[in-house]
Amino acid sequence: REDPYLYKVVSCLLANGEVIDEVTQPLGVRHYEIVAGKGFYLNGEKYPMYGVTRHQDWWGLGSALTNREHDFDLAQIMDVGATTVRFAHYQQSEYLYSRCDTLGLIIWAEIPFVNRVTGYESENAQTQLRELIRQSFNHPSIYVWGLHNEVHQPHEYTASLTQSLHDLAKTEDPDRYTIAVNGYGHANHPVNQNTDIQGMNRYFGWYEKKVQDIKPWVEGLEKDYPWQKLML
């Protein structure tokens, strides 16, 4: 957020020496790294990940938001001091990704593979992931591709599909991370072993226990799984 400087790459199509089409894309020179047990690094320096999740949904409008509503949400996100946003659980407006490039927010983008498994979603999930990556590849704000959220059994099928999605993401974009979100509360579930990062959803103070109980739980995860890159 301190200095989200962007360059511009201008691609021109020429015919007989004249420009007949032109596309301008953002170029942000940055390096993301996550080190297990230590945290997130931006351009080689430790960077705080103060995050929120954002849904593209307003009362009375549903998902059919204008840029005015997108800007309102982003203003609230900036005002609370967030440095990173998860756009869940689906591809959101192209305008949002572009605004996050200019604001210096670090983005988690994902496909709508959530909770339930039918056994028939493989082709659709791969198509949506491929399209998400190809459409959003040039946004420097995006650091990770989300493959699924709290997807439950059948475990063997879901683990295999997650591996194929991870492989697809690495083929399309070998330099960004992948993540799958775990709703089980422990880090060794087979469904969540096939991505670079493991997201952990557990809602202390909401569905169970107290907010303060998250600290010993996280410390236990770090002790038991020191090699895991974890996001909460």
Regions found by a protein language model. Give the residues of each.
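Substrate-binding/catalytic cleft of secreted carbohydrate-active enzymes
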Residues: L74-A75, T84-L232
